[in-house]
Swiss-Prot record:
It is an enzyme of class 4 (lyase). The gene is thiC. The keyword Lipoprotein does not apply. It comes from Thermoanaerobacter pseudethanolicus (strain ATCC 33223 / 39E). InterPro entries: ThiC, ThiC/Bza_core_dom, ThiC/BzaA/B. This is Phosphomethylpyrimidine synthase.
Length: 432
């Protein structure tokens, strides 16, 4: 049985109990959320070392880190290093997006070493292997994508991105209305190329019931991908994007009816003034399924700083109701991220998630900031560093920018605002 089927039967699973304890909520709250499909717990029955996390309404906003090999950098060991960095920095999930080297081995190694849920985009492996087996991506037999999905499911993958909403109907909207950047999703581009070359409907849509059978067998959470997500601000919230979203909403209902957990992916590049509307629209069209967003990136002019542009968008999206943020690293649009990029991306996304949780009233979020404020008032440097979202960086700044015995910071010194005011108010502080 899947987590959803257990919930529908009124059974609180071990995974639900772990999520409830982590979130500080009642088990019944998690049970009801999973039952309604508003909370998912990605947890493949074969991922043995998994510490499950819940994603969805009423829970803390979660962060995903993308890792994986490329044709230029096929070394699996480096991706394991990135995995460890991501988890240490606070990633709640990782996705293996490998396209280089031994993709099967990469996924298995990441699963062996990951305590957090692991996701994939099976079309990546199917496309890469189709080139060697059949000569091209478009020569791939329909059967092959399902063979890859089944193989990854057996290995223990917890959630998979599947671009099931890319149909001839949604493609027509793209052709009729035009775009600056057409399609920027790799999985989406592979799928569209296959469809147009073979003049056949997307097999993941056409044979969605078969996909559901595999997902149900292993309790894989489907992450319905946005193959028509906008790749620049100019393309945001257009007819093609919305048409795909409508189709995904229909597939959400089918997934739930089959007892399969499901969430929905979203944009992309979106102007700040359109982010809230995008989230509200997804929640309405997709029946309050958990919403997993890439960023969104709020300006196209900041390569090298897209961890910042995405954190801005992510905070707004999550505050508006998005549940799961996919990080963006400083290397986005420029190259494969290294482990430092991974850390920067996770931290930026965690800041966005936490800021949104304060706005949403997530249990315990605001209290963290109050605890930090009290530590600052008390000049408790050790506590401030401990409470920081990146304690290592906070410690380095404290040590490198100040004399080791100083009670002051080098910014204010004897002109500390808190010290001066506390002397006249009679409140207890030493210096800032």
């Amino acid at each position: 049985m899947t987590q959803l089927e257990y919930a529908l039967s009124g059974i609180v699973t071990k995974e639900m109990k772990i999520v409830a304890e982590y979130e500080g909520v009642d088990e019944e709250f998690i049970l009801e959320g999973v039952k309604k499909g508003e909370i998912v717990i990605p947890s493949n029955i074969n991922h043995k070392n998994l510490i499950p996390k819940g994603i969805g309404r009423g829970l803390s906003t979660k962060v995903n880190a993308n890792i994986g090999t490329s044709d230029a950098y096929p070394e699996i060991e480096k991706e394991i290093e990135k995995l460890n960095v991501a988890v240490k920095a606070g990633a709640d999930a990782v996705m293996d997006l490998s396209t280089g080297g031994d993709i099967n081995q990469s996924c298995r190694k990441i699963l062996e070493n990951s305590p957090v849920p692991v996701g994939t985009v099976p079309m990546y492996q199917a496309a890469v292997e189709s080139i060697s087996k059949y000569g091209s991506i478009v020569a791939m037999p329909e059967e092959f994508i399902f063979e890859v999905i089944e193989e990854q499911a057996k290995d223990g993958v917890d959630f998979i991105t599947v671009h099931c909403g890319l149909t001839f109907e949604s493609l027509k909207k793209l052709k009729d209305n035009g775009r600056v950047m057409d399609i920027v999703s790799r999985g989406g581009s592979f799928t569209i190329a296959w469809m147009l070359h073979n003049n056949k409907e997307n097999p993941l849509y056409k044979h969605f019931d078969r996909l559901l059978d595999i997902a149900k067998k292993y309790d894989i959470t489907l992450s319905l991908g946005d193959g028509l997500r906008p790749g620049c601000l100019e393309d945001a919230t257009d007819a093609a994007q919305i048409q795909e979203l409508i189709i995904l909403g229909e597939l959400v209902k089918k997934s739930r009816e089959a007892g399969v957990q499901v969430m929905v992916e979203g944009p992309g590049h979106v102007p700040i003034d359109q982010i809230e509307a995008n989230v509200k629209l997804q929640k309405q069209l997709c029946h309050n399924a958990p919403f997993y967003v890439l960023g969104p990136i709020v300006t196209d002019i900041a390569p090298g700083y897209d961890h910042i542009t995405s954190a801005i968008g992510g905070a707004i999206a999550a505050a508006s109701g998005a549940d799961f943020l996919c990080y963006v690293t400083p290397a986005e649009h420029l190259g494969l991220p290294d482990k430092e990029d991974v850390k920067e991306g996770v931290i930026a996304a965690k800041i966005a998630a936490h800021a949104a949780d304060i706005a949403k009233g997530v249990k315990g979020a605001k209290e963290k900031d109050l605890t930090m404020a009290r530590a600052r008032k008390a000049l408790n440097w050790d506590e401030q560093i401990k409470l920081s979202i990146d304690p290592d960086k906070a410690f380095k700044y404290r040590v490198n920018k100040n004399i080791s015995t100083a009670k002051t910071c080098s910014m204010c010194g004897k002109f500390c605002a808190m010290k001066i005011v506390s002397e006249y108010l009679g409140t207890s502080t030493m210096t800032c």
